[in-house]
């Protein structure tokens, strides 16, 4: 037994060492944790991210402006850290906010323009990441572009984007009054029972100072201001065409107020960017950072006035010309001293006093930034934008957008830089005229563009759509023929031509073009193939060919299961047979499919309403006609059906209202002619003649006016 004593002694010694090391480790960890927590505690108070639309940094006193009308922002800046060189990744509202709220560049999140793009549901937003850490999340936004359909509402438990509907002949609002947005944000703050919340507010530059002042006051009222982290940032610089990538467009204010004004009065001179916001805010609350973020946390420079950031070139892009008419996209990389810009030409812009050539100079910087941009773009792909919904066309036109040529986009022109800039401006002006319902003037503006630059297939396509709207069908067919000549590989051109031929009653030729579109669409997006088969099904219905209509309807559904063309076609066939109950059942099924997938289909609610009307279910029929007009505000037949329903129900005041709505929504020769014809049918010949007189004055010289008047008297 004595021989075991040394072993027991050794084991006791080892155990003592292990226990001692354990306590040393625990104590060390506690000490490190205490030191780290003391030096850099997690922000426990509320977080406010206030985005200001179109406010250049140079207009604020904290950025050197001598005269300002932003006292609240100026006061906040004195309690904050100011970033002197903060940059956006896009001179456009939606792409810049997508980067701001995801920490991803436009090529990564996929939102490349303001029209036809939305943030994918698979993308994780800052709101989602904070909500998973126990934050209550809310948002109030002013811009139409940031409504929930943009995808930016992901992760927000509360997202207020309600824009009041226009009244009478008013144009639809592109944003709501800033006071309404601030009201919504204040109400949300008042309802919070704790301080761990994240609030995002987007406001136009005109309302920015009021927003900062009122929200700061609301936090103070609830004793949350001192502990709050407030980030004020611009979405982009000066508003314009979305083309410029210079400092006036890309440089934005960035002001960060930390709890208890930590670091107040300091300035950070290193270049920073929108995609730094997500990792910074996550770091401030000690939340884990997800993989795939290209930005970096700015906490080091927030905590330490001596800290500096390593240079990291900042990416920006503009696809304004590319998506609007096939022009050349623009890209930029901003470094410490230079910005490299690539568009029609390439340019190196000095941002600071030039570097001595012995230290590298312009040629070295240009080569470095050019190579870095090449690497970034090498793996970047660009999807074509989705079509603008009919209900949104007027708003987007007022923002300078017409429906994009729905084809895999490619640069279609060799315009030089001056010509491209002038074309962007001319195209934007044409779109705004159309948004103002000055259709004839808008058509003339588009015609001037294609006279100057004939190869622009996208503009011919947009011109054809506007001519068709005005009832100038033969001219529309010519425009779409030109699209087919310029882009014979594009299914969209054949589809548009088929539609115009249908309007002209030339169904045989329409069927031929629909078949061409189907053949071309086999090599494109499945949505295009579905649209081609849907067009073929509609042509077959007009030709009373139920077999072909059914076959194409099934093919459309195979290409896109969210498109209930089979139910629509079955409903149409049953309706034509007078089986209104069965037809209504098919239309109801189609309606449910669209509701599930969030789509729309022209004439679905119209025929659903017609079926219900013939079953004497007038209130339900009225609701369907209104649904049609909500999705397709210029559907003349829906106005006609609604007016006749009101007449049958002895609702004469409603008849007058709906005919006034018709003329307001479709101020075209067709709209006036249909309204005049309906007044004639209703025995109001004087009112009909008054409308015709107004039309002659408004559309004097319009080629379609005489034909419309002749049709209206039949």
Feature-to-residue mapping (PLM):
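Canonical positions in the second alpha-helix
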Residues: 448-449, 482-483, 516-517, 555-556, ...
């Amino acid at each position: 037994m004595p021989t075991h004593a040394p072993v027991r002694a050794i084991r006791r010694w080892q155990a003592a060492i292990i226990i001692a090391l354990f306590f040393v480790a625990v104590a060390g960890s506690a000490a490190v944790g205490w030191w780290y927590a003391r030096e850099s505690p997690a922000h426990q108070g509320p977080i406010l991210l206030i985005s200001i639309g179109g406010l250049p940094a140079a207009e604020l006193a904290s950025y050197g402006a001598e005269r300002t009308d932003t006292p609240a922002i100026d006061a906040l800046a004195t309690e904050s850290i100011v970033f002197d060189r903060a940059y956006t990744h896009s001179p456009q509202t939606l792409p810049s906010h997508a980067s701001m709220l995801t920490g991803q560049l436009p090529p990564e999140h996929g939102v490349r323009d303001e029209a036809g793009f939305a943030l994918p549901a698979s993308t994780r937003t800052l709101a989602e990441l904070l909500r998973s850490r126990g934050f209550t999340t809310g948002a109030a936004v002013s811009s139409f572009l940031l409504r929930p359909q943009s995808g930016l509402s992901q992760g927000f438990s509360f997202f207020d984007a309600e824009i009041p509907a226009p009244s009478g002949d008013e144009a639809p609002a592109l944003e709501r009054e800033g006071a309404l947005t601030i009201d919504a944000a204040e109400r949300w703050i008042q309802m919070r029972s704790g301080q761990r919340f994240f609030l995002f507010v987007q406001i136009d530059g005109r309302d920015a100072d009021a927003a900062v002042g009122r929200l700061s006051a609301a936090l103070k009222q609830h004793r949350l201001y001192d502990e709050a982290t407030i980030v004020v940032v611009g979405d982009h610089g000066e508003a314009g065409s979305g083309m410029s990538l210079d400092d006036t467009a890309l440089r934005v204010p960035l002001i960060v107020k930390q709890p208890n004004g930590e670091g107040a009065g300091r300035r950070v001179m290193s270049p920073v960017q929108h995609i730094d916001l997500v990792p910074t805010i996550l770091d401030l609350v000690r939340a884990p950072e997800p993989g795939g973020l290209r930005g970096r946390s700015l906490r080091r420079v927030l905590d330490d006035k001596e800290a500096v950031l390593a240079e990291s070139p900042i990416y920006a892009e503009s696809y304004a010309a590319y998506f609007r008419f096939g022009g050349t996209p623009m890209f930029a990389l901003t470094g410490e001293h230079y910005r490299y810009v690539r568009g029609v030409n390439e340019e190196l812009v000095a941002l600071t006093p030039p570097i001595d050539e012995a230290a590298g100079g312009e040629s070295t910087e240009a080569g470095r930034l050019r190579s870095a941009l090449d690497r970034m773009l090498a793996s970047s792909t660009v999807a074509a934008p989705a079509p603008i919904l009919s209900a949104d066309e007027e708003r987007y036109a007022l923002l300078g957008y017409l429906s994009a040529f729905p084809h895999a986009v490619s640069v279609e022109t060799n315009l030089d830089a001056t010509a491209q800039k002038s074309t962007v401006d001319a195209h934007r002006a044409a779109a705004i005229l159309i948004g103002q319902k000055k259709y004839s003037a808008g058509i003339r503006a588009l015609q001037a563009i294609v006279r100057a630059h004939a190869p622009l297939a996208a503009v011919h396509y947009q011109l054809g759509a506007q001519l068709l709207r005005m009832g100038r069908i033969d001219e529309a067919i010519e425009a779409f023929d030109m699209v087919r000549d310029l882009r014979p590989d594009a299914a969209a051109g054949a589809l548009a031509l088929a539609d115009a031929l249908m309007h002209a009653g030339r169904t045989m030729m329409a069927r031929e073009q629909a078949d061409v579109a189907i053949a071309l669409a086999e090599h494109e997006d499945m949505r295009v193939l579905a649209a081609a088969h849907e067009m073929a099904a509609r042509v077959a219905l007009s030709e009373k060919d139920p077999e072909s209509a059914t076959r194409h309807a099934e093919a459309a559904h195979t290409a896109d299961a969210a498109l209930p063309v089979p139910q629509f076609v079955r409903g149409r066939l049953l309706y034509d047979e007078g089986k209104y109950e069965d037809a209504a059942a098919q239309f109801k099924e189609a309606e449910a499919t669209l509701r599930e997938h969030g789509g729309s289909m022209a004439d679905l609610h119209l025929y659903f309403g017609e079926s219900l009307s013939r079953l004497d279910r007038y209130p339900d029929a009225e609701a369907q006609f209104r649904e049609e007009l909500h999705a397709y505000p210029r559907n003349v037949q829906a106005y006609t059906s609604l007016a006749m329903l009101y007449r049958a129900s002895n609702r004469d005041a409603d008849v007058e209202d709906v005919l006034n709505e018709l003329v307001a929504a479709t101020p075209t020769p067709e709209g006036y002619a249909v309204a005049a014809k309906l007044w004639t049918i209703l025995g109001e010949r004087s009112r009909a003649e008054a409308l015709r007189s107004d039309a002659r004055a408004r559309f004097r010289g319009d080629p379609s006016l005489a034909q419309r008047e002749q049709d209206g008297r039949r």
